Amino acid sequence: MSERLSGHTLLVSLLATPIRHSLSPKMHNEAYAKLGLDYAYLAFEVGTEQLADAVQGIRALGIRGSNVSMPNKEAILPLLDDLSPAAELVGAVNTVVNKDGKGHLVGHITDGIGALRALADEGVSVKNKIITLAGVGGAGKAIAVQLAFDGAKEIRLFNRQATRLSSVQKLVTKLNQLTRTKVTLQDLEDQTAFKEAIRESHLFIDATSVGMKPLENLSLITDPELIRPDLVVFDIVYSPAETKLLAFARQHGAQKVINGLGMVLYQGAEAFKLITGQDMPVDAIKPLLGDE
């Protein structure tokens, strides 16, 4: 990267903590090199206490954009000038664009687009499909919004203590009003309803942290009768590459099992385009993710 750096190099950042596990610097810097773009991508260990100063730094230094991850995806909202329609619905941001470096910051959420592009890459369409989605944190909400925007017939959301999540209930109401998709919210502790939903679904999406450390030995589905030859199972966790859920689904004959690496790639590609105006060379970047 040092050969590419110059007095004209444009900086893109990542604001999150922890950041050491992030695939983003490798992805974006390799993409800049492939396209000959005079950009550099750096990760900064920033939590909510330093976030306001960091955002002011984006404005002051003319940083062209930033990715935002935990714990800053919701905390950054009041620090921005505008939000995309999806980010406003979700109530979270993972990409900030500083157009022309002039300090007007617009927040976007690319998690949903990334998930849907990952599914499409595997030949999975969500249009007119019934989908069960577990976990309605920032990523889960973004995926739910994109599923509705892309024409899913029905989305059955499940989350622990779901009835206490007023923000999610508001999202459900808005999606039912704004789209033709039927969206419902139920408690994940209601295993009868959860199992019934999966039995009637074409696609099950796990957007919880179950399956990654320290929960790597757990799975939301443990009943083999729930796994059918026409069921697609998508776990947004990418490390480990095969979670216990995906291994269980594969062993019991699911139509297809998909991990979160594709979502990482395509949400990054969408952020890349928002900031640079260029398409990320995803075919060249995809092999890098397999090294992890």
Swiss-Prot record:
Gene3D superfamilies: Leucine Dehydrogenase, chain A, domain 1, NAD(P)-binding Rossmann-like Domain
Residues that, per the record, bind shikimate: S22, L23, S24, S69, N94, D111, Y238
Keyword Kinase recorded: no
GO molecular function: NADP binding; shikimate 3-dehydrogenase (NADP+) activity
UniProt xrefs under CDD domains: NAD_bind_Shikimate_DH (cd01065)
TM annotation in the entry: none
Cross-referenced Pfam families: SDH_C (PF18317), Shikimate_dh_N (PF08501)
Assembly information from the UniProt record: Homodimer.
Protein name, as recorded: Shikimate dehydrogenase (NADP(+))
Gene: aroE
